Amino acid sequence: MEDLKTVEASDNVVSDNVEKVNPELIDSTIRESNIQSATKVDNIPQSQTDTEETQQSQTDTEETQQSQTDDTTGNAKIYVDDTFSPSDAATAAVLTGKDSTSTTIVEEVMEPDEIGLPSVKITEAATGTARNGGGSPRTVSSPRFSGSPVSTGTPKNVDSHRGLIDTAAPFESVKEAVSKFGGITDWKSHRMQAVERRKLIEEELKKIHEEIPEYKTHSETAEAAKLQVLKELESTKRLIEQLKLNLDKAQTEEQQAKQDSELAKLRVEEMEQGIAEDVSVAAKAQLEVAKARHTTAITELSSVKEELETLHKEYDALVQDKDVAVKKVEEAMLASKEVEKTVEELTIELIATKESLESAHASHLEAEEQRIGAAMARDQDTHRWEKELKQAEEELQRLNQQIHSSKDLKSKLDTASALLLDLKAELVAYMESKLKQEACDSTTNTDPSTENMSHPDLHAAVASAKKELEEVNVNIEKAAAEVSCLKLASSSLQLELEKEKSTLASIKQREGMASIAVASIEAEIDRTRSEIASVQSKEKDAREKMVELPKQLQQAAEEADEAKSLAEVAREELRKAKEEAEQAKAGASTMESRLFAAQKEIEAAKASERLALAAIKALEESESTLKANDTDSPRSVTLSLEEYYELSKRAHEAEELANARVAAAVSRIEEAKETEMRSLEKLEEVNRDMDARKKALKEATEKAEKAKEGKLGVEQELRKWRAEHEQKRKAGDGVNTEKNLKESFEGGKMEQSPEAVVYASSPSESYGTEENSETNLSPQTKSRKKKKKLSFPRFFMFLSKKKSHNN
């Protein structure tokens, strides 16, 4: 891949037109390398017949420019290959058959963020052409010859460190160049082969990716087997240690037995020789050995006692830890039980608050209904009372009118009585005067009028006087009758006035009672409002408690979980303490074995990593070779050994850098896999938590639905009870109204008297007013109006009779 990229970069650098190159870079590269090699690159065209001076002038003017060619023009070319050797350069020079001396200029063409091999650009100073035979078929400064690096054909006025660029076309076509160097001309088939190889490589990669999980399972099984083997190894090591201890004991016992046998032999020899015990060396040696054994036994006993004491201390510490852990577990269990109790109490309180809230809500609804009913009844009563008050006022106005009419009648009666008295006085005076006149007529006849008066005139005067007297008497009787009628009317009107006053007093009393009832109803309404406010405050408190209850329940559940976790932690600590006590004896050996196994694992991992890197490197090399074969160009370069070594060194460094990058990529891949595994584990944990929460939410929703169903059932029962209660109340109200109507009707009948009172009003007005007001009155007022209806016609009949009689 890198070779192809460098070749593409070099192809981008080379063009048909000659471009400028930094002369400082050329001089620095020449001074660093100090190499001048004459390389045979390409053929000079036949049309080129310029001399050395013209070429020198061209190189002087164009020495800071680069040559770039394509497949058709064929100017000086750049070719980079890590497998290039000096022999290839020599063969290229022989094939071209051109004598030229040139200096090589090394120029690195690098792409960003890529490591590529340096590209080599060849500049040459031509001394002749193939046509005039000025060139030599073999270069003087070839790596195969040891000579001067300076070309013999270089002009004197040109610096030896300055190179010349040949812009001639080396080949007529790409096919010719490829056929000269033994390349491949069937590019399509080559590309197809490259594509097939790439597909094969991709399939192999897919197979490798598919085999990765199998290898993972194999590695897991191998790790499990390794753990089992390690356990067996630990057990065998323990057995080996025990056997070693037993062997040491047996060896010490054997040595002691040997010492005892040797001392016994010495003692037997001394006894045979007759040496006493006080002087014998064997006895002394036995005594010293016994003392030494005694001291060693004492030291061992003391060490064993110390070990026992330490073990007892450790055991006591473990027992204390166990007791502490057990206490912690018990405390945690007690805390969890208390939390459960608190949760139960809170649930009971929640249920009680819900019930109280429902009852308060029901009482609130009842109070609202009562308040609405009381308000409606109060409105109806006030409306009825207003109507009754208006009727009473109208009746009072009528009574006032009747009183005024009675007063007018009294005044008329007084005037009539005064006229009657005057008439009586006039009659008496007339009678006296008439008697006197008759007396005078009978005694004396001196008056001419009386004398001349005839007898029939006197009879006519007497008759007229009698008629006048009769008329006066009739008028007197009429006036007396009218006076009696007026007296009766005034008495009846006084009675009616007294009755109206009593009814007005009763109405005022009713109004007072109604005001008292209204005040009591208002007080009850205020009380119900205060109760409603208290119920609403209780509802708010209950809602706040209901809002806080889930939090408290959650907190209690969290505390219970914490207590359970503490209990589990305490149990785990106890178990770990026991395991640590058991593993304290063989800790060192197990640690060594683990370290050894870890080292082995590290080495195996490194080896597998190396194998993977080698495989990746081989794949990359195969791809690079394939692509290099795909992009074979007809360019060849002859380099010196030092340049080749430097290039190979750089290639090796590039390979190392690539390997380092591959290793870093592998490590990143492993880290990514680890992070992926961790994320998957976290995802599984989150999924578990989500499942648990979903289950809890489902249970909570089921409980809420059950509670709602219960609430709906209670509300339905409450509605049924209210409907039944309303029906009963309506039935009772209907019965009461019927009773009141019956009582009022009977009372009206009892109150009707045979002596009806007449009123000064027309029949049409009385009937019209009664018919309009009858619909909006209570039963009592209806009964009273019936009595008035019965009395009014009699009154009008009496007045009509009186008028007809007067006429």
From Swiss-Prot:
Subcellular location: Cytoplasm
Phosphoserine, modified sites: 148
Annotated signal peptide: none
Low complexity compositional bias, start-end: 46-73
GO cellular component: cytosol; peroxisome
One GO-annotated biological process of the protein: chloroplast avoidance movement
Assigned keywords, A-Z: Coiled coil, Cytoplasm, Phosphoprotein
Subunit record text: Interacts with PMI2.
Biological role stated in the UniProt entry: Required for the chloroplast avoidance response under high intensity blue light. This avoidance response consists in the relocation of chloroplasts on the anticlinal side of exposed cells. Acts in association with PMI2 to maintain the velocity of chloroplast photorelocation movement via cp-actin filaments regulation.
Protein name per its UniProtKB record: Protein WEAK CHLOROPLAST MOVEMENT UNDER BLUE LIGHT 1
Organism of derivation: Arabidopsis thaliana (Mouse-ear cress)
